[in-house]
């Protein structure tokens, strides 16, 4: 499994930009996944940017190098190409426009390079992109930690297993909120805090299949058990789950090693066991 971070994407875009032709007057995004690469390329070259709908309507944004009335060649960009469905849909929508249109994708499934005019790197599946891991296929099949992933971790003084902790459960700042239903939430929060946890999840519209909490009756009992990562790994062994997203580097490595499956660590932004 391959993991591409924002940082790696930006590095790849800088390299790709050097190879792309210089006679491109504007860059067009295939929403939403094409928004990042297309806008980065447009900003780098200081040329006009638009979306597929915008191109049809003749609406462009930004860019001082090319006036809107002198746009002759447009690069339509997506972050990746697998089946080519999005590219085909864009071609159909843009067919007939009185302008030269070329197509590109940063990452392309090997063998499908012919579907675009320009591509940067062949990339087989499975692969995960940082910018959409919480918004599609992988989230649907993932186990997610709560503290450190969905919301911030409690600081020391908040973690008193009492009134301060209950305030934290109500007011925890969100971090990564998925836009699709996730397979399971697997947390070391105690089972007795389920009502507060479910209330917070409803507040931020987090949709999930299961909420699996720690069975210990107290913080001290959970510490004595010392099975923070072990229990997560045992749950993750279920073949229904294809990815675990964990905040703690130490736990992420243990979960991956025990379950023999990939774990994405949000603290380090690395994929272990991929």
Which stretches of residues belong to each language-model region?
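Short active-site oxyanion
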Residues: 23-27, 182-185, 240-243
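PRPP-associated nucleotide enzymes
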Residues: 1-143, 149-172, 192-195, 199, ...
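Acidic beta-strand-to-loop metal/phosphate-binding motif
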Residues: 74-78, 184-188, 242-248
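Acidic, Mg2+-coordinating phosphoryl-transfer loop and its flanking beta/alpha structural elements
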Residues: 104-106, 239-274
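Conserved beta-strand scaffold positions in the cores of enzyme catalytic domains, especially
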Residues: 49-51, 101-103, 211, 244, ...
């Amino acid at each position: 499994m391959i993991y591409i971070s924002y940082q790696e994407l930006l590095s790849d875009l800088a390299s790709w930009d050097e190879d792309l032709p210089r006679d491109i007057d504007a860059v067009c995004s295939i929403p939403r996944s094409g928004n990042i690469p297309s806008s980065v390329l447009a900003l780098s070259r200081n040329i006009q940017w638009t979306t597929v709908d915008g191109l049809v309507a003749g609406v462009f944004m930004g860019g001082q190098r090319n006036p809107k009335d002198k746009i002759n060649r447009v690069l339509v960009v997506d972050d990746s190409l697998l089946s080519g469905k999005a590219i085909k849909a864009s071609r159909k929508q843009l067919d007939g426009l009185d302008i030269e249109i070329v197509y590109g994708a940063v990452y392309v499934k090997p063998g499908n390079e012919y579907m675009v005019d320009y591509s940067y790197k062949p990339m087989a599946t499975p692969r995960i992109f940082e910018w959409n891991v919480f918004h599609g296929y992988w989230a649907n099949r993932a186990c997610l930690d709560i503290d450190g992933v969905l919301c911030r971790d409690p600081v020391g003084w908040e973690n008193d297993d009492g009134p301060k902790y209950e305030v934290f459960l109500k007011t925890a700042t969100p971090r990564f909120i998925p836009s699709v239903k996730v397979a399971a939430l697997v947390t070391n929060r105690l089972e007795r805090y389920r009502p507060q946890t479910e209330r917070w999840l409803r507040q931020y519209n987090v949709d999930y299949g299961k909420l699996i909490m720690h069975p210990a009756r107290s913080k001290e009992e959970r510490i004595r058990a010392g099975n923070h990562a072990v229990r997560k790994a045992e749950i993750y062994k279920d073949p229904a789950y294809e990815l675990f997203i964990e905040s703690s580097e130490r736990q992420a490595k243990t979960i991956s090693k025990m379950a023999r499956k990939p774990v994405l660590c949000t603290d380090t932004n690395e994929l272990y066991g991929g």
